[in-house]
């Protein structure tokens, strides 16, 4: 009945709240739990009944306490002791567990602490209206804010891969993060919380590609599942270490009883053969655990303090390290997983990591395969590589010299361990089966199978990402990791294979009782010879290693000289190229000046031609004007002549009329002379007047004729 009501309340909680991870019952319990609020309590899990495992000084407590006594404690013996018991408290870092050194909030974080701190004065005098300056870390400025980095990533995804952008989840809530911290029993860094408050990872069953160049960003639920899976792996490995060392299982010691102890097919923890077999596998596996930079990450395969935030769905993870090594930093981003016996610190914090991803997107180092819907990192040469390889190569390039020195030390340690292991095997077998010189020289280090790296560190092409850097791996890692995992699965078989030589030696002893002294003497002699030959072989190997080192140094010097010569040649070529470019530039300037002069001359000629054409047009216009004036004058003269002609014709008509009138008058006068004799005097007067008029008319006609002649002329 309670389960039914719990289901109903969970459903109502999921509908009425934006929580994605938190539930009603778990949220109420998480608020009362001491997991996230406890500063001194290490990680544990009551479901596994293994809480005692993390309470002893030899368990996973390194890096999970803030008390001065716990943070300053360390096992004696240095690196050798750490390798013998890698799960001990080995965190001598001064970095605070609960707050990043770049964070404004210097107090250990607990759910609700930031909200309650608003409005309160800080003990150092920092008020809510002031801003505390952030310190530089390792000479580097603080990382950009998580919100700014996510804004750049979202902008790129929205422009270039909107389908992938749709797969990013909605923000998580404060309740989700508080419950996750309670489940993980830790306090997450502030930048991780800020990132989850922007995007709660990607959809669990979305597209195959991840937002981090094909690497999937995990949501809170998947983070909890992955963390729990790797935590169980760490517990299982701790059990194997307990069996191999044969320690007495006690609650205070953090070691558990071997479940196979006392069975007829297995050896007891104190059995010499079982101890040799287990120590061989454990030592070989521990020898493969490494970190770059040195001492930054604990030398273990898995740790509950590593919180996975992204993975490639193949067992490789990008995580924040909440249990760093003595030279590490709390909250650093590391690579760990199935293919990473050597752990790499790729960023100081999750904020730095997101800023680096955003920079890679902005530089254009990406390619989307639309056929497979995969997002790849693209090099400058156009080749596609895994982003895990890119991150690993960047770290190796930064710590190249340190890796070379450590590789040399590791080889010397492997040779010494080989000699010691041969002596232990000889004592365990009673000295009857001493290794031959050929076998001694060809036998690898105990449990290593192959050197940790297939090539010297100086031969690794870790500078150029465009090469297939995926092939640059430690060939012995897979062998060593698989050897330990095989021991975990089937320990009885391994113990049985080691027992066989001992049974054979017992049979030989039974047959040779009569010659026991001769056998012992021969065995001692063979033992001495083998020891001398082993020392000689070790010395030769050391000499050869020194010669190889000298040859490598010489090759490095020659390479440096060649690079210097090449740089000088490039500098000379650059100077010559600059001089040639300068000469060409001057020549181009001269050509431009000549072109400008020619153009100016052409413009001047064109201007002169235009002026000449203008003057010619002006002269033509003047000629036309003079012709027009002459035409107007001629027209005026013609009009005058026509007018004179019209006047002359009028005068002629008047003269004709006068002649007619005169003739008519003469006729009338003749008639009147006959009728009127008395009027002679009057007629005489009239004739005189007629003569005057005639003379006047004649003079007028003469003047008109003269004018007409002048007009014709």
Swiss-Prot record:
Record's compositionally biased regions (Low complexity): 22-34, 66-81, 88-103, 413-429
Spans annotated as Disordered: 18-129, 255-274, 400-457, 500-713
Start-end of Basic residues biased regions: 701-713
Alphabetized Pfam families for the sequence: SMI1_KNR4
InterPro entries for the chain: Knr4/Smi1 (IPR009203), Knr4/Smi1-like_dom (IPR018958), Knr4/Smi1-like_sf (IPR037883), KNR4/SMI1_regulator (IPR051873)
Segments of skewed composition (Basic and acidic residues): 400-412, 507-605, 613-662
Superkingdom to which the source organism belongs: Eukaryota
GO biological processes: fungal-type cell wall beta-glucan biosynthetic process
Name listed for the protein in its UniProt record: KNR4/SMI1 homolog
Organism: Yarrowia lipolytica (strain CLIB 122 / E 150) (Yeast)
């Amino acid at each position: 009945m309670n389960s039914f009501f719990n289901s109903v309340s969970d459903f109502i909680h999921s509908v009425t709240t934006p929580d994605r991870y938190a539930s009603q019952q778990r949220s109420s319990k998480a608020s009362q739990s001491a997991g996230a609020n406890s500063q001194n309590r290490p990680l544990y899990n009551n479901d596994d009944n293994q809480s005692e495992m993390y309470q002893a000084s030899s368990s996973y407590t390194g890096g999970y306490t803030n008390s001065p006594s716990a943070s300053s404690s360390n096992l004696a013996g240095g690196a050798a002791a750490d390798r013998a018991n890698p799960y001990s408290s080995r965190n001598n870092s001064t970095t605070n567990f609960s707050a990043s050194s770049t964070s404004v909030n210097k107090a250990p974080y607990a759910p609700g602490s930031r909200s309650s701190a608003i409005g309160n004065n800080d003990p150092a005098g920092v008020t809510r209206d002031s801003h505390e300056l952030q310190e530089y870390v390792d000479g580097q400025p603080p990382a950009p804010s998580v919100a700014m980095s996510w804004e750049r990533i979202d902008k790129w995804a929205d422009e270039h891969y909107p389908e992938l952008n749709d797969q990013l989840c909605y923000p998580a809530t404060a309740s989700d993060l508080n419950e996750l911290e309670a489940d993980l029993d830790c306090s997450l860094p502030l930048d991780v919380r800020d990132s989850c408050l922007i995007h709660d990872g990607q959809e669990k069953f979305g597209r195959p590609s991840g937002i981090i160049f094909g690497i999937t960003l995990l949501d809170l639920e998947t983070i909890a599942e992955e963390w729990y899976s790797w935590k169980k792996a760490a517990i299982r490995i701790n059990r194997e270490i307990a069996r191999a060392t044969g320690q007495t299982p006690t609650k205070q010691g953090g070691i558990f009883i071997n479940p196979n102890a006392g069975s007829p097919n297995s050896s007891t923890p104190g059995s010499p053969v079982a101890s040799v077999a287990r120590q061989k596998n454990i030592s070989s596996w521990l020898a493969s655990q490494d970190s770059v930079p040195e001492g930054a990450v604990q030398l273990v395969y898995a740790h509950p303090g590593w919180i996975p935030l992204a993975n490639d769905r193949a067992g490789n993870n990008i995580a924040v390290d909440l249990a760093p090594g003595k030279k590490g930093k709390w909250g650093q981003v590391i690579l760990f997983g199935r293919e990473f016996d050597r752990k790499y610190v790729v960023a100081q914090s999750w904020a730095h990591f997101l800023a680096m991803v955003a920079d890679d997107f902005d530089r254009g180092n990406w390619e989307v395969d639309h056929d497979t819907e995969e997002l790849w990192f693209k090099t400058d040469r156009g080749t596609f590589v895994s982003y895990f390889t890119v991150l690993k190569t960047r770290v190796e390039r930064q710590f190249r010299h340190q890796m070379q020195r450590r590789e040399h030390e590791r080889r010397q340690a492997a040779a010494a361990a080989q000699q010691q292991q041969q002596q232990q095997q000889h004592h365990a077998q009673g000295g009857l089966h001493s290794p031959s010189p050929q076998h001694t020289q060809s036998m690898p280090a105990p449990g290593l199978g192959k050197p940790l790296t297939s090539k010297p560190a100086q031969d690794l092409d870790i500078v150029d990402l465009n090469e297939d850097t995926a092939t640059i791996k430690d060939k012995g890692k897979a062998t060593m990791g698989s050897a330990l995992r095989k021991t975990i699965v089937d320990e009885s078989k391994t113990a049985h294979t080691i027992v066989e030589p001992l049974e054979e030696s017992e049979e030989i002893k039974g047959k040779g009782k009569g010659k026991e002294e001769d056998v012992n003497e021969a065995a001692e002699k063979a033992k001495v010879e083998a020891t001398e030959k082993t020392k000689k072989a070790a010395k030769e190997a050391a000499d050869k290693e020194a010669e190889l080192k000298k040859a490598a140094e010489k090759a490095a010097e020659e390479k440096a000289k060649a690079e210097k010569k090449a740089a000088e040649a490039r500098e000379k070529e650059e100077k010559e190229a600059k001089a040639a470019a300068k000469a060409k530039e001057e020549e181009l300037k001269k050509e431009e000046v000549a072109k400008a002069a020619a153009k100016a001359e052409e413009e001047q000629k064109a201007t002169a031609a235009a002026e000449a054409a203008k003057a010619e047009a002006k002269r033509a216009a003047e000629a036309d004007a003079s012709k027009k004036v002459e035409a107007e004058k001629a027209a005026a003269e013609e009009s005058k002549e026509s007018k004179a002609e019209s006047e002359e014709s009028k005068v002629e008509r008047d003269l004709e009329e006068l002649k007619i009138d005169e003739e008519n008058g003469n006729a009338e006068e003749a008639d009147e002379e006959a009728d009127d004799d008395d009027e002679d005097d009057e007629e005489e007067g009239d004739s005189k007047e007629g003569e005057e008029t005639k003379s006047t008319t004649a003079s007028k006609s003469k003047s008109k004729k003269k004018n007409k002649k002048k007009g014709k002329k």
